[in-house]
């Protein structure tokens, strides 16, 4: 999607199968099950969401609500998280809101936060049953981690706050992934690391990093694996419990240039001059596929659809194949 238009392409030929446009700007595109989820702006922010069948472009469920002027969309395949600087929402595939948190323009309940009264949401991620967010609140110097779970009322989620002493609002700390009961979070101090925190706020695992990640770092979810490209290497975690498995780093003049995806039972890792084909169990390289890419500084994000391997390079989607 770009501008005011969302297009569906044939994954093999690249031909446009369908397009959908609105008379307002597109804020972002995500996905859930077989649907693309397109979010457009209106006078209440980026809150106009439409689902579109990925094969035909036929419209499905839609929703509208208050939102920030800029949002980041993410999905675990069954739910969609829309997160801005002051508000987030978790949507089911039918676009019913499961959970909302943060500021709202029209307060209905005393517990609701009016505009300019809440915290800045520095980073957020979700699973189908939980949301975790790093917040910068008031004059507090440190971020806090807030663990959210859907409750009887979608705008009154269960909350558990975890202090993160020494982690400033602009430190680069980031929620990497959320499972049913755990959260993986990158924390830069006192030493760069990934902590895994359970629903009680207890740290149940910690992995040190040899260097801080780049600001362009990217997380992807593929089947039973979560991969995080730090800008230097790809770190791999289990989806279910977020246990750290292994890392794939530079080898000679070749280094990872993006996160990984699974295709035909193999872990496909974009590297400087091609694709490293690795064993998903231990990360050991098994094969190499040369790929010519124009020089660039954007992450290369691989995607698998059926037997087709795609790469997202900035705003360009490239289908890889023989030839």
Where are these regions (language model features)?
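Acidic, serine/threonine- and glycine-rich low-complexity intrinsically disordered segments
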Residues: 102-239
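Hydrophobic/aromatic beta-strand positions that recur at structurally equivalent sites within the blades
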Residues: 9-10, 50-53, 90-93, 146-150, ...
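N-terminal export/targeting signals for secretion/compartment entry
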Residues: 283, 291-294, 306, 311-323
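Long, acidic/polar, low-complexity amphipathic helices and coiled-coil-like
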Residues: 8, 13-143
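Aromatic (tryptophan-biased) beta-strands that constitute blades/sheets of beta-rich domains
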Residues: 1-26, 50-66, 95-108, 155-166, ...
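Intrinsically disordered, low-complexity segments enriched in Gly and acidic/Ser/Thr residues
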Residues: 208-217, 221-292
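Repeated scaffold domains used in trafficking and secretory/extracellular systems
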Residues: 22-35, 64-78, 108-124, 163-180, ...
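Short beta-strand elements that form the blades of beta-propeller/WD-repeat-like
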Residues: 1-2, 30-44, 50, 76-90, ...
